[in-house]
Amino acid sequence: MATALAACAPPRPAPQAPRPAPSAPSAPSAPSVPPTLAPGPSGLTPVFHHGPRTGDRTVALTFDADMTADQGPRAAAGERFDHPGLIAALRALEVPATVFMTGRWAEEYPDQARSLGRDPLFEVANHSYSHYAFTGDCYGLPTVSADRMRADVERAYAVFRKVGVPDPKPYFRFPGGCYDRTALKALTPAGVTAVQWDVVGGDAFATDAEAVARQVLDGVRPGSVVVLHCTRSAAPTTERAVRRVVPELRRRGYRFVRVSELIAAANGRAEPPRAGVPTLEP
């Protein structure tokens, strides 16, 4: 009987090897330090106009999201200073780009600012908080005094952080592109590289998208920085112009990059591609 009961008893489970303790999650890698230019003469803020004129046909499309500090009432009345159709087109075409954003624009459109800042296709750079001129006589813009210039730039960065832009770049575009020695000296402590351009898109207040596209296509050379705008009310033709420009430049063998990559090339070092950004071939 004892033998029969032993035969009917369920087999003992085999001893299990001890499970390894779960590994701690790896710490996120620190963001790479964006390339900048060395200070200019007398330690002034350096100014970048274009990348190397080499056989590597690269071009950077840049877009100014330039709502001015005193335009809040116009936005409240329905004027649109954003351009979601343009951003959607850049995403659909897989075009990396640099957006020079004012702090006031980011305040008005925080969700869009955050979306741009978190999309690896784009990089967000500084276009001041107020979009007031840093010199006199600059396209009729109000002016910011020399003793407030640095604060205006730093206020924009503070807004970017507040709305959730994780990694705004240390690049600054002067409102209207207007600057002088006083402005360069005032911004030296901010540690930014001023970014100008060598190709004017001419989209501000333009009504002919084909004319804007022709102006860009006629001006682009290897290493070019193209200035356009990300504002529906002031630049309504930009999206259509971009849809014309992008395939044509690719047909000519150009590769679209962000400004950081051109600055890295100017410094003689390659900027590694960021995760999630497709390699774009012409």
Identify the function of each model-found stretch.
Residues M1-P84, A113, R244-V245, R252-P282:
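N-terminal pre-catalytic segment of deacetylase/amide-hydrolase enzymes
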Residues V33-N126, S130-P142, R155-P168:
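Active-site beta->alpha N-cap acidic-glycine motif
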Residues T58, F81-G85, E108-D111, R148-A151, ...:
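Extracytoplasmic/secreted proteins, especially bacterial periplasmic and envelope-associated proteins
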Residues V59-T62, A97-M101, E123-N126, P170-F174, ...:
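Structural recognition of the beta-strand scaffold that forms the well-ordered cores
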Residues A69, A77-G78, M101-P110, R173-D180, ...:
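Acidic-and-aromatic substrate-binding clefts and catalytic sites of carbohydrate-active enzymes
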Residues R91-V95, G117-R118, E154, A158-V165, ...:
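Sec-exported extracytoplasmic/periplasmic mature domains
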Residues G117-E123, A151, T207-A209, A213-H229, ...:
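Accessory recognition modules or surfaces
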Residues Y179, A183-V220, Y254-A265:
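His/Asp/Glu-enriched short active-site or ligand-binding loop at hydrolase and phosphoryl-transfer sites
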